[in-house]
Amino acid sequence: MKNTPTQLEPNVPVTRSHSMGFVILISCAAGLGGLLYGYDTAVISGAIGFLKDLYSLSPFMEGLVISSIMIGGVVGVGISGFLSDRFGRRKILMTAALLFAISAIVSALSQDVSTLIIARIIGGLGIGMGSSLSVTYITEAAPPAIRGSLSSLYQLFTILGISATYFINLAVQRSGTYEWGVHTGWRWMLAYGMVPSVIFFLVLLVVPESPRWLAKAGKTNEALKILTRINGETVAKEELKNIENSLKIEQMGSLSQLFKPGLRKALVIGILLALFNQVIGMNAITYYGPEIFKMMGFGQNAGFVTTCIVGVVEVIFTVIAVLLIDKVGRKKLMSIGSAFMAIFMILIGTSFYFELTSGIMMIVLILGFVAAFCVSVGPITWIMISEIFPNHLRARAAGIATIFLWGANWAIGQFVPMMIDSFGLAYTFWIFAVINILCFLFVVTICPETKNKSLEEIEKLWIK
């Protein structure tokens, strides 16, 4: 392909607008990986009610159908760092898209719950690989001043995928009788997963490899071409020097460095960010939204419609986060967001306890929690996990943190039905409230601020 960005001459003058357009292009391309994550996160919320009736699922099996994709996700994240360091970020992202496409086809055609679970594990493998590498790719290409906003594109595309899928679920649910939904409708919900996977794969065909990975692989000229297109020739040469200096450190180190004083703190922060992102309650609403709304007294159709409203709020406040992250800062947004999330969870649990769930106020409380999450912990977790680790350990270290993220994701998907069945909705949401309070304390006391810092400057926070 003669016109791909990787084939630009390094001595071509680069304007700020031209450079910015290129940066946004490659960031959006990688961010599309979030569509896969978002689609699968939301699609199962529409399908699970039909699957429960079709296969007479117990709370444990209901959780397993939902959480099975996280099993593959843990494996995918675990191997993504090694594979991407060896073969490049772009090739592994393309592999992730293919795995998800296979999963969508097999899931839609499955004739028993075992096949469905296996198919979802395959899809999880692809999503796990993509979830850590998409943000890593953007982080390694973006200029420091706008890196946070561009890295949050992954979360934005995730939310767009979630929101669009809620509307797809609603459209499918309205396409036939409930009986049709039990036997056929859920298959269409899962089959449409082919669309984001194909889009992701095709877009990756026309974007370049990560300049930092190219420099690491000894392809200095190619790395300089891409950096020149991003920053202009003068800045590109300086950036390349910084990359090469950090890569020299890699030759003297190993993954064991992460467990030494200094970097060990970075690893702990990355892991805790990942855990809090998953266990503060957002995924419970995402995975079980229609079912929770039915428990509040909503009918089948009303539950799907209300979930669509949740999706719209997610999109709006994620866009707001993209605009604020590099202006307000990561730490401030997360501290404010986690405080509000704790308040909303306390009020939601109290409403369930006193059975005050039939009015508009309950929906407002849930939407308030969703908004607080999407403007803070939701997008910032992915950004900071990709920022806080040294260049020579970033992919593998981010992979470790994301393994914990997917492990926590699995636990929520698996055990929330059992928690609701055993404790009821009130105590379940109060548990999430306590976790949000812990998240607030963690952000305020431990998390660093990385706004407007280069990756090399962030590395110096740990290596003193």
From Swiss-Prot:
Inducing factors: Transcription is repressed by the binding of AraR to the promoter. L-arabinose acts as an inducer by inhibiting the binding of AraR to the DNA, thus allowing expression of the gene.
Stored InterPro entries: MFS_dom, MFS_sugar_transport-like, MFS_Sugar_Transporter, MFS_trans_sf, Sugar/inositol_transpt, Sugar_transporter_CS, XylE-like
Bilayer topology term: Multi-pass membrane protein
Predominant subcellular localization, coarse grouping: membrane
GO cellular component terms, A-Z: membrane; plasma membrane
Phenotype caused by lack of the gene: Deletion of the gene does not affect growth on glucose, but the mutant cannot grow in the presence of arabinose. Deletion has a negative effect on the ability of the mutant to grow on alpha-1,5-arabinobiose. AraE/araN double mutant is unable to grow in the presence of alpha-1,5-arabinobiose.
Protein name: Arabinose-proton symporter
Origin species: Bacillus subtilis (strain 168)
